[in-house]
A protein has these predicted regions:
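Repetitive helical segments and hydrophobic/amphipathic motifs
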Residues: 14-15
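Compact, glycine-rich, soluble single-domain proteins
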Residues: 24-161
Length: 161
């Protein structure tokens, strides 16, 4: 193998592992939580939104029962959907079931985590430590990275093969 080819292979492997290292992935049992993030909030705001992706890697369903975050007095899982030509937002009561092999994306305009009665504003660049609780898998510690106020989902890292 030529020196140039060896170098390119090494750079490709480094890039692939660096992308994986930058991805925020957390696991508890078969439940995988990817890229938790939140939007920055203006001063005085009492609510904020959190987003992530949950994948059930197991063979049985599980249920997201709740989320906790010290900066919020109350946290709920909400769903937004169109009903009769109007966008409706409601709390998901009783937890959100995630079937075997199912991936659920929490994103603006869909499922999201509603942080309520904020104790302090979320500032871009902050990292908010919280927990997700699943019915069967248990509890997992996560860190929500705070993006800008108008941010969309952060780009997923690209993995080279």
């Amino acid at each position: 193998m030529s020196q140039t080819r060896k170098f390119l292979v090494a750079v490709g492997m480094l890039a692939a592992t660096a992308g994986a290292a930058l991805a925020q992935t957390y696991s508890v049992g078969p439940m995988k939580v990817d890229q938790p993030w939140a939007r920055a909030t203006p001063g005085g705001a009492k609510v904020g939104g959190g987003y992530l992706t949950i994948t059930n890697m197991g063979a049985t369903p599980d249920r997201l029962l709740g989320v906790t975050l010290p900066q919020a007095a109350r946290v709920e899982v909400h769903e937004m959907k169109m009903e009769g030509g109007t966008m409706q937002m409601r709390e998901v009561k009783g937890g959100l079931e995630i079937g075997p092999g199912q991936k659920v994306e929490f994103k603006p305009g869909g499922y999201h985590i509603m942080f309520m009665d904020l104790r302090s504003p979320f500032k871009q660049g902050d990292k908010l430590k919280g927990q997700l609780s699943f019915e069967k898998a248990g509890t997992v510690d996560v860190e929500f990275k705070v993006e800008s106020i108008g941010a969309g989902a952060p780009a997923a890292p690209k993995h080279g093969h």
